Amino acid sequence: MLYTFPWREYMVEEKNNEEIRHLVRIMNTDLKGAKPVEYALTGLPGIGRRTAILIAKGAGVDPTATLGYLPDEEVAKLDRAIGNFEGIVPSWMLNRQKDLATGQDKHLLGTDILLTFREDINNLKKVRAYRGLRHERGLKVRGQRTKSTGRRGSTVGVSRRK
């Protein structure tokens, strides 16, 4: 069977003696078993393609292998490698560097990312920082121009003279 991705095609061979697992559970998330490991792991919030490839190589699993055909031992290796991701990569690759509360470098996964992000924005609002005020008012935060773009609401048309 041929799976086409925008940048690459993968041939997934049908194995007669083995049945594919269509859902594989890793880190309390159901991942699609028909995809290669490097793409299936991106279903976890906090893991992109680059980190997925590093996790697969760190676990000793082929990144292009189909996730649904992997034995349970290799899936467990992937699970352990995701939990130990901070030990595999340098600190500049982690998504939470110098945490405000602890000062440690972490890699957040799953709902922890959303909760931490929301908490950071609320802290900015609480201390009345410039970025927090922009978030409160619903304006652009990162220095973009706002004269003509970023407008919301219905447009006001121009009436023509008769």
UniProtKB/Swiss-Prot annotation:
Keyword set, alphabetical order: Ribonucleoprotein, Ribosomal protein, RNA-binding, rRNA-binding
Ranges of compositional bias, category Low complexity: 151-162
Extent of Basic residues compositional bias: 140-150
Residues in the signal sequence: none
Gene Ontology CC: cytosol; small ribosomal subunit
UniProt key word Ribosomal protein: yes
Residues in coiled coil: none
Disordered: region residues: 140-162
GO terms of biological process kind: translation
InterPro entries: Rbsml_uS13_C, Ribosomal_uS13, Ribosomal_uS13-like_H2TH, Ribosomal_uS13_archaeal, Ribosomal_uS13_CS
Keyword RNA-binding annotated: yes
A GO molecular-function descriptor: structural constituent of ribosome
Family: Belongs to the universal ribosomal protein uS13 family.
Task of the protein: Located at the top of the head of the 30S subunit, it contacts several helices of the 16S rRNA. In the 70S ribosome it contacts the 23S rRNA (bridge B1a) and protein L5 of the 50S subunit (bridge B1b), connecting the 2 subunits; these bridges are implicated in subunit movement.
Quaternary structure note: Part of the 30S ribosomal subunit. Forms a loose heterodimer with protein S19. Forms two bridges to the 50S subunit in the 70S ribosome.
Listed HAMAP family: Ribosomal_uS13
Protein name as catalogued: Small ribosomal subunit protein uS13
Gene that encodes it: rps13
